[in-house]
Swiss-Prot record:
EC top class, as a word: transferase
UniProt-recorded Gene Ontology molecular function terms: rRNA (pseudouridine-N3-)-methyltransferase activity
Origin superkingdom: Bacteria
Residues that bind S-adenosyl-L-methionine: L76, G108, L127, G128, K129, M130, T131, W132
Organism the protein comes from: Allorhizobium ampelinum (strain ATCC BAA-846 / DSM 112012 / S4)
Name of protein: Ribosomal RNA large subunit methyltransferase H
Metal-binding is among the record's keywords: no
């Protein structure tokens, strides 16, 4: 199963981007043994609309256009389920085993995700109840993807 990330907004060069790249490289190297492949990070421009609802709607249209055919969509949102790393790895592994071709994890813009898009997602997940800057969300997501692969492969990186 290919796993990709769609993110509204760009991650500038610097230590945060380097750390994201390091975890995604680890995922890309470890994933194939578990039947997982990293496709890419697709960065979309932020809407310049004057109000939040319009910005979220415009960004949702861009997100939808960027998705492959019939992907499993995981939306990151503060209203989502709170899972531990094992639950996330199990979810990824189960869908891979069912023959899903693509999973896309979506990070919304500064205003969050459009409610209609969020409601259509296959899974809405949060990375904790606190508010996180985009750079840290990307780092945490990249690390959790790598951790999921290590859990699925029985690698000792994850210690439960």
């Amino acid at each position: 199963m290919r796993i990709g990330i769609v993110a509204v907004g760009r991650l500038k060069a610097g230590p945060e981007k380097d750390l994201v790249s390091r975890y995604l490289d680890r995922f890309a190297k470890a994933g194939p043994a578990s039947g997982l492949e990293f496709s890419r990070v697709n960065e979309l421009p932020e809407s310049r609309a004057s109000n939040s609802a319009t910005r979220k709607r415009e960004e949702a249209v861009q997100i939808e256009k960027s998705l492959p055919d019939n992907p499993l969509v995981v939306a990151l949102d503060e209203r989502g389920k709170s899972w531990d790393s094992q639950e996330f790895a199990t979810y990824v592994g189960d869908h891979k085993d069912r023959g899903r071709r693509d999973m896309v994890i979506v990070i919304g813009g500064a205003d969050g995700l459009d409610p209609d898009f969020r409601d259509r997602a296959d899974l809405v997940l949060n990375l904790g109840k606190m508010t996180w800057p985009h750079q840290l969300v990307r780092i945490m997501l990249a690390e959790q993807l790598y951790r999921a692969v290590t859990i699925l492969s029985g690698h000792p990186y994850h210690r439960s």
